[in-house]
Structures are given as C-alpha cells and as structure tokens.
Regions:
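C-terminal soluble interaction/assembly domains
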Residues: 273, 279-367, 377-379
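Bacterial Sec-exported substrate-binding components of ABC uptake systems
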Residues: 21-105, 213-242, 309, 362, ...
Length: 379
C-alpha cells in the first residue's frame, strides 16, 4: 500500500509539473497570423490569433492624423498566457473591468455594448452627454484634457483608451509605460467610412472578452444603414451641400473620400467641393468658400450657432448665402447638454444610420418623415 501511494504521489507531481510547463509556455509571435476578426468596413485594425492559444493580438495601423507606416500591436492575454517572446507592446488581460475613456466616443461604444459600468474615468466629464456617466459623476473621475496621472493611478485601470493627435502622444505613452498602466490607441476617427467608425466597437468588445457581443451589435448597423440608403437610390434630384464655417481665416473642407462626403452621397445629395481627393480635410481660402456658399442648396455643420441670426453675426457676408436666404441651413447640435456637451460628437460614431436618416430627412423630406435626432433647422 505504501509503495502504491508513493507511485500515485509521484504521478500527480509529474502531471502537475507538466501542466505547469504547458500553461506557462509562450506561443511565438510569428504564430499569431490567424484572422480572428477581419473588419468589413474599418481599415485601421484587425484581430489575430494562434493555434493552441486563447490570447489574441489586436493590430492597429496609423492611429493618428498624418501617421505613415505606424503599426501598433496589443496582446490580449487569456488564461494567464504570457506575451510572445520579442513582443514589446502593451499586454492587456482580457475582461478589462476598469476602463478610462479619453474620448467620449468610447463611452458611446461601451454603451452600445451594454458595458458602461466598466468606466471609471473619462476626459472632460462636463462635456459628456451620456446620462449614466452624468448620474455617476461622484464615482467616475474626470481625468481632464491632459492626463492626471496621480488620479489615474488611484483608479487602477485595466486599460486606458487613447486617441492620438500627431506626435503629442509620445509623452503620454512613455508615462503610462513607466507606470505599468496598459493602454490602447483607438483610430476610429480616421476611418473614411461611417460604418468603419462604428466597427471599432469590436475592438472594445475584444478588450472586455465579449467579441461575440460586439460583432452581434455591430452587424445590425449596416442593415439599418443600407435600408435607408436604398430609399435614395432612384432619386433624380441631388441638391448641393456646403460644410462648416471659417476658423482662423481659413475654411476647412472635408475630402471627397471622407465619411461626411459619403454620408451626403448616401443621403441623395452632392458635396459641392470636389477639389480635395486626399485622405484628410484641407483649408481653403475665404473667398473661395464665399463663392461656394453663394451656390450651395444646403449648408450644414455650421459651428455652435443655433439660429440664422447667430450665423449672420459670425460674418455679415453669410446673409448672402443661398441656404441662408432660402432657410436651408442645418446644424448638428440639436442634442446639447446644459454644460456644453454635444451628443453628436459622442454617440453618432456608433449610430451612422441615425445620422443618415437625419440627412435624408433634410434633403428629401418626402422619403423620411421622422424628426431629426442630431440636426436642428436654423430659423
């Protein structure tokens, strides 16, 4: 009996050692080449996996304006798996519970996934529109426009959701690395497809270890979007549309490849400025812009104004604009908070179908009878 017991103990010890060796084994970085999720509309990310590994790699390309050949990888660890040898990026345990959002767009994405309770910090809470966040201002901390690192440490975040602007993010990432706080750069705002922007919610669903929910929620958005777009497929009249107002003696105009130009086209209208075919907005001279507003049938996204009188007060020349004379000016600021937040810049990223419905109602009211959700008619 004693001999059998000794053998049994030795057998169990061997199994324990072998099991430990297997669980601690690192999968090589080169093995992460299987497509776990390939976006249909977004171009800035993909999710990769490997055989015999529950962990994944999120690869993000050029996540800020002007970035070229910038590739970032994030290891999403599951079952205690270690990052592959040679991997130098952030390691984020799947199922992140404490999340800091440095853009309100990420609040909207987590809201769409039903995961607002994971948010422990935001940037500029007074400009947030989400009712849940506003109702929990005592417990959800405001990180400020520039990161408050002392406050951040106290929150013990599992991940910080960042957006990059030029090379200014270098100091932020260096500090987060020093503090051993995981982070990920989101690049949804650079997507040229309205649906591509919304598809970034799948990245967040990967972080919270519920990829299936992200895919399920997202796949309904294109269905609604294309059902609305189909309403304009056979129209014969395409009114011309002008964007924006001056900023610092120049007038920034979207590219013909931009998500706004695509929304305008899908809503059955015609973007009036076709000279910019790049992948970014461009400033044009004021005289050129004044010439365009003389001709455009509609004028939208006109800053912070809420009436035609306020718009004309910005510049008396605006009184001569065709859309001002014909009262066809609309602004994307119908959903303002008392503290200055604008829900368009927060939730529209995950509701491109609602934005499209608004625009169809504006340009072709006979096709959509619903009152606009994001847009106000300036009177």
């Amino acid at each position: 009996m004693k001999k059998k017991s000794t053998i049994s103990i030795l057998t169990l010890l061997c199994l324990f050692v072998l099991t430990g060796c297997v669980s601690n084994k690192k999968t090589s970085l080169e093995a992460f080449k299987q497509d776990v999720y390939t976006p249909e509309y977004a171009t800035g990310f993909k999710i990769l996996g490997a055989d015999n590994s529950a962990s994944t790699l999120i690869q993000i390309s050029n996540p800020w304006q002007g970035a070229k050949n910038v590739e970032m990888s994030y290891f999403i660890s599951r079952n205690g798996e270690q990052a592959p040898a040679g991997f130098n990026g952030p390691v984020i345990p799947a199922g992140a519970r404490n999340i800091v959002c440095m853009s309100s767009s990420y609040i909207a994405m987590l809201d769409a996934l039903g995961e607002l309770k994971r948010i422990v910090g935001v940037s500029g809470i007074n400009y947030v529109s989400n009712p849940y966040i506003l109702a929990h201002k005592d417990s959800i901390k405001d990180m400020g426009a520039e990161m408050n690192y002392e406050l951040l440490l106290g929150l013990k975040p599992d991940v910080v959701l960042l957006y990059g602007i030029g090379d200014a993010q270098t100091a932020v990432t260096d500090k987060l690395k020093e503090l051993a706080i995981p982070y990920i750069y989101m690049g949804e705002y650079l997507e040229e497809s309205p649906l591509g922007k919304a598809e970034w919610m799948v990245v967040l669903s990967e972080l919270i270890d519920n990829r299936e929910k992200g895919i399920e929620v997202f796949r309904e958005i294109p269905k609604r979007y294309y059902a609305l777009k189909a309403l304009t497929d056979s129209i014969s009249q395409h009114p011309t549309v002008m964007f924006n107002t001056p900023w610092n003696d120049s007038w920034v105009m979207p590219s013909t490849q931009s998500y706004m130009a695509q929304l305008i086209a899908d809503a059955g209208a015609d973007y009036i400025y076709k000279e910019n075919n790049s992948n970014s907005s461009t400033p044009i001279g004021l005289e050129t812009a004044y010439g365009l507003i003389q001709k455009a049938d509609y004028w939208i996204n006109v800053g912070s104004v809420t009436t035609l009188d306020e718009l004309k007060a910005v510049n008396p020349k605006f009184a001569d604009a065709k859309a001002v004379r014909e009262k066809t000016v609309y602004n994307n600021n119908l959903r303002l908070t008392s503290t200055g937040g604008n829900d368009y810049w927060e939730s529209a990223v995950v509701r491109p179908d609602v934005v499209l419905r608004d625009l169809i109602h504006i340009f072709h009211p006979e096709l959509v009878s619903d009152s606009p959700y994001y847009y106000r008619h300036l009177e």
